[in-house]
Swiss-Prot record:
InterPro entries: Aldolase_TIM, DAHP_synth_2. Its main location: plastid. GO terms for molecular function: 3-deoxy-7-phosphoheptulonate synthase activity. Residues 1-74 form a transit peptide. It comes from Solanum lycopersicum (Tomato). It is found in: Plastid, Chloroplast. Residues 54-81 are annotated as: Disordered. It catalyses: D-erythrose 4-phosphate + phosphoenolpyruvate + H2O = 7-phospho-2-dehydro-3-deoxy-D-arabino-heptonate + phosphate. Pathway: Metabolic intermediate biosynthesis; chorismate biosynthesis; chorismate from D-erythrose 4-phosphate and phosphoenolpyruvate: step 1/7. Belongs to the class-II DAHP synthase family. This is Phospho-2-dehydro-3-deoxyheptonate aldolase 2, chloroplastic. Residues 68-81 have a biased composition (Low complexity). Involved in maintaining the supply of chorismate for the biosynthesis of the aromatic amino acids and other chorismate-derived metabolites. The lineage of its organism: Eukaryota, Viridiplantae, Streptophyta, Embryophyta, Tracheophyta. The keyword Chloroplast applies.
């Protein structure tokens, strides 16, 4: 299991298939990543032996339970999903499709050299870990687990240090404990970490004082300083991003399995600046109750030495955006014969790149990682059904997570139609709320921010809609940090517009700080508790 000591060795990661070792220019390109220069002949490399940490003999979860039916709503006009024309997939077949949001590298030869180097690097994650996560997400789809996915909007090279990684991991541990206690169900902890660098942009260029330069697309592409050198896409940044991702994951593994995440340490996870806050007080009260329960278990003769009490499972995720990099880290698993993108356990396709005939969907349909689909109020129900069919033709539970980002009012109007369309198609998905992206505003000072009240309202709308539709609220997806930043306004320790500039450190979008994140987790835990008690009372009738 991911980042856990109770793992089993089960298979080897083979070297890439012949298709994968073909030159990067073997298919015509429709984007500026590639030129028409010839490349070297195919290389044959010895297979890479890598330990998988989950049981490869387990089949992915496929629900054998009939899905709930609901009468069609008068306003929902979704037709059955049309048949999808299948073409043969290859690791580079995305190049035959239109690829959006890719930077233009001026030095194509250097780009090819860098991608070849990354192609020969070891995988960052293992296929067995991704399969294990898919199984857990399958449980969330059935209402038997809850996904907590969070981390930076975009990781940066400048803020890369052990303390920042530890603090984000620690607040996720705290939030996971709160959610698990309230929901009385497993919490699947997935970080937007160890690879969340690239960001899509509304415009390819940015103009200031008559100077027009390429937009900042994340530290793995270019720099955020507004000068020609910084804004020119640099292939060497891809290698630095790989190294930082590997180092981040290495530290996360140590935290998850080295005793730091042991449940007995629950009272020690409080961050210093939340210690004397309302949320810190609530957390200490919860931690004391957990301590009492652990003491009772010890007195009853139940051992605290079991790995489940000493370690935690933790997975990584990022948006699948920079396709040449993702291709270079794709490996064929020798056990299953399937391809896995070994840059992360979980990848998602964004609002700007989820076109049915686009390059990103083409790439993702061929990899076996669990996938997310970001969905706004602009998503047509029939298009969502077709996209799910393309990405999950076998209808495996845990394969697809729908991450909704709409704003509270749009959520109440639009989400029911999406749920009904997916249900009518018989598709199994995990429904998750992203209450961040639909609530971004500009403060009077010009900085982007997000009101905590709006974030809370969207989370409540998400739960209300699922209560109404009889479906399962499967998780939450947050842009957050363990640092004491002032980027989102509101919360119990009220951050005002005037406070924003004091600790506004984000490289992209505003994040919840640790106190706001913990406060939101208590709100979600209360909704999970009410659902649990309501379900129990229904069973008792």
């Amino acid at each position: 299991m991911a980042l856990s000591t109770n793992t089993t060795t089960n298979s080897l990661l083979s070297n890439k298939s012949l298709l994968q070792n073909q030159p990067l220019l073997s298919s015509p390109s429709k984007n500026a990543f590639f030129s028409n220069k010839s490349t070297k002949t195919v290389r044959f490399v010895q297979p890479i032996a890598a330990v998988h940490s989950s049981d490869s003999n387990k089949n992915p979860i496929v629900s054998d339970k009939p899905t709930k039916s609901s009468p069609p709503a008068a306003t929902a006009t979704t037709a059955p999903a049309p048949a999808v024309t299948k073409t043969e997939w290859a690791v580079d077949s995305w190049k035959s499709k239109k690829a959006l949001q890719l930077p233009e590298y001026p030095d194509q030869e250097e780009l090819r050299s860098v991608l070849k180097t990354i192609d020969e690097f070891p995988p960052i994650v293992f296929a067995g870990e991704a399969r294990s996560l898919e199984e857990r997400l399958g449980e969330a789809a059935m209402g038997r687990a809850f996904l907590l996915q969070g981390g930076d909007c975009a990781e940066s090279f400048k803020e890369f240090n052990a303390n920042n990684i530890r603090d984000t991991f620690r607040i996720l541990l705290q939030m996971g404990a709160v959610l698990m206690f309230g929901g009385q169900m497993p919490v699947i902890k997935v970080g937007r970490m160890a690879g969340q660098f690239a960001k899509p942009r509304s415009d390819s260029f940015e103009e200031k004082d008559g100077v027009k330069l390429p937009s900042y697309r994340g530290d793995n592409v270019n720099g955020d300083a507004f000068d020609v050198k910084s804004r020119t896409p640099d292939p060497q940044r891809l290698i630095r991003a790989y190294c930082q991702s590997a180092a981040t994951l290495n530290l996360l593994r140590a935290f998850a399995t080295g005793g730091y995440a042991a449940m007995q340490r629950i009272n020690q996870w409080n961050l210093d600046f939340t210690e004397h806050s309302e949320q810190g007080d609530r957390y200490r009260e919860l931690a004391s109750r957990v301590d009492e329960a652990l003491g009772f278990m010890t007195a009853a003769g139940l051992t605290m030495d079991h790995p489940i009490m000493k370690t935690t499972e933790f997975w990584t995720s990022h948006e699948c955006l920079l396709l040449p990099y993702e291709q270079s880290l794709t490996r064929r698993d020798s056990t299953s014969g399937l391809h896995y993108d070994c840059s992360a356990h979980f990848l998602w396709v964004g609002e700007r790149t989820r076109q049915l005939d686009g390059a990103h969907v083409e790439f993702l349909r061929g990899i076996a990682n669990p996938l997310g689909i970001k969905v706004s109020d602009k998503m047509d129900p029939s298009a969502l059904v077709k996209l799910i069919e393309i990405l999950n033709p076998q209808n495996k539970a845990g394969r697809i997570t729908i991450i909704t980002r709409m704003g509270a009012e749009n959520m109440r109007v639009k989400l029911p139609h999406l749920i009904r369309a997916v249900r009518r198609a018989g598709q199994i998905v995990t429904w998750v709320s992203d209450p961040m992206h639909g609530n971004t505003i500009k403060a009077p000072c010009g900085l982007k921010t997000r009101p905590f009240d709006s974030i809370r309202a969207e989370v409540r709308a998400f739960f209300d809609v699922h209560d109404q539709e009889g479906s399962h609220p499967g998780g939450v997806h947050l842009e957050m940090t363990g640092q004491n930043v002032t980027e989102c306004i509101g919360g119990s320790r009220t951050v005002t517009f005037d406070d924003l500039s004091s600790r506004y450190h984000t490289h992209c979008d505003p994040r919840l700080n640790a106190s706001q994140s913990l406060e939101l987790s208590f709100i979600i835990a209360e909704r999970l508790r009410k659902r649990r008690l309501g379900s129990q009372s229904t069973l008792g009738q």
